[in-house]
């Protein structure tokens, strides 16, 4: 097994320094014809930077001031971008930040995130060193009066997803992971334009521009299943684990006999 990529710092949005306009230059006495220089257009699909980390940091700054997202009036103010190693071969994508994610400005740090971390560790990987985690929407969806929303969360609407999905697609273009795990139906819809139940989409790989995508249940679904008793909770966890075994196999990760039998 290849040595996991080196750890990268948690990526957070940084405000851009104020733009300084250059001083006007005196006109030249004569204009000599010359060939126009060739320049590369800077865009979300072609972010500036010499490393993946620099490109991701630039994307985070663009997401911070996303006028299309903020202009909806249905999202809260705090931008939560991503966490993990830009050199990772495995990427997880969820739907949107919740209360804890907004408070800590990091995706998947609440109860569902803690369960995701356990899944990652059970795969024999480390968070954040070996993986990269992001969301379809970078702002927590607003529910009622923002001042009294408290811990209440909701899934993003199709309009909110359409405004924000360009950022996670740009991240994928930079990271170029060898596999993506779409956590829940919202992530599947945003990445793959698929609708329907996760049960109908999971268990097999889908294609996103040549990158295999495994759709599986969101960790919050597994937490809700625990309320239905241990038998159902174990059965649903086994389904997710079977999906992760397929991902591990695709990535060439070692799978022990003990790992094969988890939740069986």
Predicted regions and their residues:
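A polyanion-binding, active-site-adjacent surface
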Residues: 1-264
């Amino acid at each position: 097994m290849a040595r996991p990529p080196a750890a990268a710092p948690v990526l957070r949005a940084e405000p851009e320094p104020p733009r300084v306009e250059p001083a006007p230059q005196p006109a030249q006495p004569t204009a000599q014809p010359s060939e126009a220089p060739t320049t590369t257009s800077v865009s979300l699909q072609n972010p500036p930077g010499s490393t993946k980390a620099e490109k991701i940091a630039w994307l985070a700054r663009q997401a911070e001031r996303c006028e299309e997202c903020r202009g909806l009036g249905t999202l809260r103010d705090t931008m939560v971008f991503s966490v993990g190693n830009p050199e990772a071969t495995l990427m997880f994508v969820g739907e949107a930040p919740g209360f804890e994610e907004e408070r800590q400005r990091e995706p998947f740090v609440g109860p569902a995130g803690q369960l995701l971390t356990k899944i990652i560790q059970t795969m024999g990987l480390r968070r954040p060193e070996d993986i990269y985690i992001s969301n379809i929407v970078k702002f927590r969806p607003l529910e009622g009066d923002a001042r009294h929303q408290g811990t209440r969360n909701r899934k993003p609407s199709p309009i909110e997803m359409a405004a924000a999905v360009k950022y996670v697609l740009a991240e994928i273009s930079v990271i170029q992971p060898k596999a993506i795990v779409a956590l829940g139906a919202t992530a599947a819809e945003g990445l793959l334009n698929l609708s329907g139940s996760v049960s109908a989409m999971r268990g097999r790989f889908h294609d996103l521009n040549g990158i295999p995508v495994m759709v599986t249940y969101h960790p919050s679904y597994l937490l809700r299943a625990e309320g239905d008793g241990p038998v159902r909770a174990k059965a649903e966890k086994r389904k997710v684990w079977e999906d992760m075994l397929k991902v591990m196999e695709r990535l060439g990760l070692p799978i022990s006999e003990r790992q094969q039998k988890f939740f069986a």
